[in-house]
Swiss-Prot record:
Additional remark text: The reaction proceeds by a bi uni uni bi ping pong mechanism.
Record SUPFAM superfamilies: Nucleotidylyl transferase (SSF52374)
InterPro entries: Cyt_trans-like, Pantoate_ligase, Pantoate_ligase_C, Rossmann-like_a/b/a_fold
Keywords recorded for this protein, A-Z: ATP-binding, Cytoplasm, Ligase, Nucleotide-binding, Pantothenate biosynthesis
A GO CC annotation given for this chain: cytosol
Location(s) in or outside the cell: Cytoplasm
Active site, UniProt feature: H33
Catalytic activity, as annotated: (R)-pantoate + beta-alanine + ATP = (R)-pantothenate + AMP + diphosphate + H(+)
Gene that this sequence comes from: panC
Positions contributing to beta-alanine binding: Q57
Protein name: Pantothenate synthetase
Similarity annotation: Belongs to the pantothenate synthetase family.
A single BP term in Gene Ontology: pantothenate biosynthetic process
Length: 277
């Protein structure tokens, strides 16, 4: 596996490749990330991964400085997955000049749910993904359903900019107790880690209620948030939405495919999760 930081060297290395499969990450790789690499290999060859902790998607009071950086361990894991190239640019490599041009997602999708609680987050995500796509020029790119809203925004962005890249959705990988794998799980204290699966448990309760015929979505959302709050969580949202556009389902949407999404803080750690219904 070649580890490359230069955009020009990356393009030279990939010249002539027309089936490249790309997996962008921020590093601190776990089994969820590695499952993306395996899925990428099913859809293209060679597989290119990137590691870049993108300052643009972190708010002023978020965890950019303490976000876990484990490059040596990440390289070993990617080598075992037979990744062809790891693109690991520095901030100066990727942003040699101030990034004056930004990609703004549409308000209807970018300013709800995560966008409401993390202003500017999706602008930062779209900008770096667009830049990484320009560098790698992949045939396919793999994103996890764990970040459901991000997946939808990136897919729409690629469609509307006519990028020649198909976005492949990967299923969420969970620990044996149901907790969705995340690099931020390492922030959890021991007692918090034992409590953390309750987020997925509440999502399952909401999903079961909807599948049993409950159509008062606000009632089940509020009940789930109250249950978490009673256990010491600080929920930002638990929301049943249409998979197609992440808007609330109305009476006319009886046959719409749904997803329930959640974000909540447990101690100092903010966790997100979702389940398709």
């Amino acid at each position: 596996m070649k580890v490359i930081s230069s955009i020009h060297e990356l393009r030279d290395q990939l010249r002539g490749q027309n089936r490249t499969a790309f997996v962008p990450t921020m590093g601190n790789l776990h089994e969820g990330h590695l499952s993306l690499m395996r899925l990428a290999r099913q859809h293209g060859d060679p597989v290119v991964a990137s590691i870049f902790v993108n300052r643009l998607q972190f708010g002023p009071n978020e965890d950019f400085d303490k976000y876990p950086r484990t490059m040596e361990a990440d390289i070993e894991k990617l080598q075992k997955e037979n990744v062809y190239v790891l693109f690991a640019p520095t901030e100066k490599d990727l942003y040699p000049e101030p990034q004056e041009y930004r990609v703004h997602p549409p308000h209807d999708l970018g300013d709800i749910l995560e966008g409401e609680f993390r202003p500017g987050f999706f602008q930062g995500v779209c900008t770096v993904v667009m830049k990484l796509m320009s560098c790698v020029q992949p045939r396919v790119a793999v994103f996890g359903k764990k970040d459901y809203q991000q997946l939808m925004i990136v897919r729409r962005m690629c469609n509307q900019f006519a990028l020649p890249t198909d976005i492949i959705a990967a299923e969420t990988v969970r620990d044996t107790d149901g907790l969705a794998l995340s690099s931020r799980n390492r922030y959890l204290q021991a007692a918090e880690r034992a409590e953390a699966p309750k987020l997925a448990a509440e999502l399952n309760r909401v999903r079961d209620a909807v599948l049993s015929g409950e159509r008062d979505f606000a009632k089940v959302e509020q009940a789930a948030m109250a249950a978490l709050a009673a256990r010491g969580w600080q929920p930002d949202y638990i929301a049943v939405r249409k998979r197609s556009d992440l808007l609330p389902p109305g009476p006319q949407d009886a046959n719409a495919q749904l997803v329930v999404l959640a974000a909540a803080k447990l101690g100092a750690t903010r966790l997100i999760d979702n389940l398709e219904i």
